[in-house]
Amino acid sequence: MVTTKRYDYVPIDQVQEHPLIANHRELNESKVAHYQRDILKNGLLEPLVVWERKQREYFLVGGFHRLNAIKRIRAEHPGYYDRVDVRVVTGELEEIRALNL
């Protein structure tokens, strides 16, 4: 069963994509641009959802477009979003893969 383990504030470089749980759709450039503007204006209002496999090893489960927006913000504004809010979930790999966030 997938459960929320905790909410945390982690270094963005520790959030990675895992090939077996990449359940996102194709990257939508207009959606990423929208998130860039929104995050710069209002901050990250909804945390990324990550699966913690080992201590400080986080794999993205939900928030693919937001993560890409943050990466682009960081490229344009060094020092922004070195850390991000995340919801850390636990569960077996098959349960995590079944999520469609």
Indicate where each model-derived feature is located:
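Short, charged/polar surface micro-motifs in flexible loops or helix N-caps
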Residues: 66-67, 92-94
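Alpha-helix initiation and N-capping motif
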Residues: 32, 94-95
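Short, Lys/Arg-enriched N-terminal segment that forms or immediately precedes the first helix
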Residues: 96-101
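Short, charged/polar connector segments at secondary-structure boundaries
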Residues: 1-87
